[in-house]
Curated annotation (Swiss-Prot):
Subcellular locations according to the entry: Cytoplasm
GO BP, one annotated term: trans-translation
Domain of life: Bacteria
Protein's UniProt name: SsrA-binding protein
GO molecular function: RNA binding
Function: Required for rescue of stalled ribosomes mediated by trans-translation. Binds to transfer-messenger RNA (tmRNA), required for stable association of tmRNA with ribosomes. tmRNA and SmpB together mimic tRNA shape, replacing the anticodon stem-loop with SmpB. tmRNA is encoded by the ssrA gene; the 2 termini fold to resemble tRNA(Ala) and it encodes a 'tag peptide', a short internal open reading frame. During trans-translation Ala-aminoacylated tmRNA acts like a tRNA, entering the A-site of stalled ribosomes, displacing the stalled mRNA.
Xref: HAMAP family: SmpB
Primary location group: cytoplasm
Length: 160
């Protein structure tokens, strides 16, 4: 089996849908409590964050909806649950800030990415406000106009 190339930033998976659906206001770095088979699957980049979010309950943060696919070579005596809730490790001040902000109307806490930081797995979570449909269209229009501008600049340089 060929070795997988390491991502230069150590990113394992990203939640691009969260950036599309929310205005990201604050980002936090949280540790993840994982079992052995989950770490092996993360090394093989078998993780999806598409519909994952953070649940704040009883002064703790939990990652919900994150799907880590178990490897076929994983241990047979452990029953692997790919969508189990995983505890996020944050300090008290960060938890209080998240809890107070989520209780406000329109704020949500979502997972943006999972990455390696040295030998530890970290999860980047963000506090965001939901976008309306017209906000999404406006963002798309801005992105298209920026692309057109870059193309014009690039073609102008080639003519000279």
């Amino acid at each position: 089996m060929a070795k997988l190339k390491k991502h230069p930033t150590g990113t394992i998976a990203q939640n691009k849908k969260a950036r599309h659906d929310y205005f990201i206001e604050h980002k936090f770095e949280a540790g993840l409590v994982l079992s052995g088979w989950e770490v092996k699957s993360l090394r093989a980049t078998k993780v999806q964050l598409v519909d994952s979010y953070v649940l704040l309950k009883d002064g703790e943060a939990w990652l919900m909806g994150c799907h880590i696919t178990p490897l076929k070579t994983a241990s047979t005596h452990v029953i692997a649950d790919p969508t189990r809730t995983r505890k996020l490790l944050l300090n008290k001040r960060e938890l209080e800030k998240l809890t107070s902000s989520v209780q406000q109307k329109g704020y949500a806490c979502v997972a943006l990415s999972v990455y390696w930081k040295e030998h530890l797995v970290k999860c980047e979570i963000a506090l965001g406000k939901g976008k309306k449909e017209y906000d999404k269209r406006h963002t798309e229009r801005e992105r298209d106009s920026d692309r057109e501008l870059q193309r014009a600049v690039r073609s102008k340089g080639k003519d000279d």
